[in-house]
Amino acid sequence: MNVTAKSEHSSLTNQDVNWFLFDETLWVTKYKEYMQIDDSIAYSMGSFNWLYESNDTVLFHKKDARFETAVIGLSARIKLGFADKYINYICKGKMGNLYYAENKNIDFVFSPAFIYDENQDLLLSFHDNFSHKKDYVLFITEDFGFVIIDHQLKGWVLQRASRHVCVHRKRNMGIAPHMIARYLSALDVWEEKEDMTELESLLAACKQEGGVFYEALKECMMNLI
């Protein structure tokens, strides 16, 4: 996906970046409901995840090509890992606005390799062919940025990721990074082996505190059965 960047203020804020942990999607948009995103397609260009397709949704306004919405599918794509080698690039990122540089809709999917670094509390999709001389991270909010390589949209970065976790539409639940990592690890075991042992262990650990996270985890496990 060809894009350009401008050094200008984005209309999006950190409040518009939501990681729906149990729905396995990352939303970067002013819209609160999926129907609103669906309605916006009439005046948007870019990539959209139609029924039975696996595209990531990345939409730009037809009028001025300005970025508006991203809905990134995370299902079976997040692995626990270390993001140390990317930190320097992220720290040198710049603020701005993203613009579409094509004149048609396309099929677009971010790299399937997503990493969550518990120690850095970073969720990201990064490419090893990143060149510090010409490539950059463009932050459109304080915490969320796109990875631009050779004028193409190639990845993204979410700093302080745990603060953006949403459970049952409630954000910033105070879920610690180590709990997120434990859930992602348990989910990975389920997806690879259909073994619920780790998920059941996590549910038992959360039972005493109860709350929204416990109820959502229990519901998630029931849906998996």
Predicted regions and their residues:
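Amphipathic N-proximal alpha-helical interface segments
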Residues: 57-67, 145-147
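Short hydrophobic beta-strand segments that form the core of ligand-binding sensory/regulatory domains
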Residues: 72, 157-158
